[in-house]
Amino acid sequence: MHDLSEPARVVLAGALDEDENVDVLAPAVGSILVLTDRRLIVLRQGAESRPMTGIQSFALDRDLEVRIAPTIKQVTVASSGRAISVFMRREHLGDVESLVAELRRRIYAA
């Protein structure tokens, strides 16, 4: 799990199911988007000290909406009436687009 600090690795490892695999990581400002074999996780910087908001999990189903607004460098994740936004740096746009493309492929292949 590249680009993750040791505390972030520990928090993420604790949030994963025993047999869950991390497939794609995409950095964002103050957070990282994590696509596993069964869900999307938004892991915020400092998650180890804020367990209620530091890690958000979204099931890979057709309720999940992920929108990228490249002009303002914002990613919005919404599902089941809740939504969060993260910002990305221009140099990470390709990583985020790849993660979202893979996420959509998985959702709509089912």
Q: Which residues make up each language-model segment?
A:
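Short acidic, glycine-rich loop/turn motifs
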Residues: 44-47, 77-81
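Residue-level detector of beta-strand structural context in well-folded domains
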Residues: 22-24, 31-32, 56, 64, ...
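Short loop/turn segments that connect beta-strands within the blades of beta-propeller domains
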Residues: 36-37, 71, 79
